Amino acid sequence: MFSTTGPYSVVARSMLNGAMLAFRENAEAAGPVVLEPIVVNPSGDLARYRALSLELLGAGIRQVVGCYTSSSRKEVIPCFEKFDGLLWYPSHYEGFESSDNVIYTGASPNQHVLPLVDYLASRVGYRAFCVGSNYIWAWENNRIFREALTARGGSVIAERYLSVGDTEFDQVISAILDQRPDFVFNNLIGTSAYAFFRAFRAACKVRGIDQANDIPVASCTLSEPELAEIGGGAIDGHLSSSVYFSSLNSPPNAAFIETYAKAFPDGPVSSADAEASYIAVKLLAASLEQAGTDDARPVRAAVANQRLLAPQGEVRIDPQTYHAWLTPRIGRSAANGQFEVLLEARSPVAPDPYLVQSSPRFAVTMRSPVLRVVQS
């Protein structure tokens, strides 16, 4: 269930590609469990997400891989809880959520927000200007970011929110340039994000500012398919915190990239969310085989026993939170549309969706993943 049309369709199409690649590999393996995908497109419409979820669940389909935005996920969770189905949610998100009817294969906030704060505070600066799409992802991500940055002695000097799909940034960019933060923390999504990157780079150029070095833009969402959408000489020098980049140098990723490119020559290229969708289907197939049924509770119990060598490295589902152990990384975008990996964790990091082990709000010393420098 991916919105392959609408304001964030580029990312959603890469997610669908990742899922379909895993379905294809499942069919080719000819194992005891054969998955037959049914693809639906909510087009970014929340009401449509709910209607399609009810339609699928009402037809007896208990396992659904999908949703990108947090608003869509929250819209459909009550449907899955009512019908006792499982939603496999394959995207990074803001955390602070738990449901017996959701398996989270994307990054939790301690796996993407906190590593980014550590990197920025230690290497870029302490004054942030936050801009985001006006919905829960940006609200919560900015809240976590502000809390973590403040704990490091930094500050958020301003926050601005725009409607999803909004592409008018003159006032926001003027405010950024007037206040000259050390960096911009970007939580815009889809077409809004692409327009912002282009407009901000152009405005800085007019003022003689080297945007990538003087006021870098950092985010937890920017991915390879989106760099292609930004275009216009504005794709290089941006920082992204992610558990996967397609430039990872490893045999599992090389095989994944080759197979993905052959399967989807027209794109979009692979991304962290595409990989998370691939992981979700792989874990679903293994869990169905172990459970011997598609009932939600046995499948949920079975997924905690699975281990997967994914393109990013080892992945497993935490049996307490049903979020994934993943490997945090920091990347910097290059003009070739790829990311140079600057830092990465040495091993998968346990999910901490409520930041119980990571947040100063709980009177615990902040502990974000320790990342090592990656040699070029």
Question: Where are the language model's segments positioned?
Answer:
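Short beta-strand elements in bilobed, periplasmic/extracellular small-molecule ligand-binding domains
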Residues: 28-44, 99-101, 150-166
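Extracellular/periplasmic periplasmic-binding protein-like sensory domains
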Residues: 200-276
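Beta-alpha junction/loop-to-helix N-cap segments that form part of ligand/metal-binding clefts
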Residues: 14-15, 29-95
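Extracytoplasmic "Venus flytrap"
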Residues: 1-17, 40-44, 269-273
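Short beta-strand segments enriched in small/hydrophobic residues
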Residues: 1-14, 23, 68, 127-131
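Periplasmic-binding protein-like
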Residues: 56-70, 89-90, 129-130, 180-196, ...
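An alpha-beta-alpha
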Residues: 105-161
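Solvent-exposed, acidic/polar segments of extracytosolic/periplasmic ligand-binding ectodomains
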Residues: 311-376
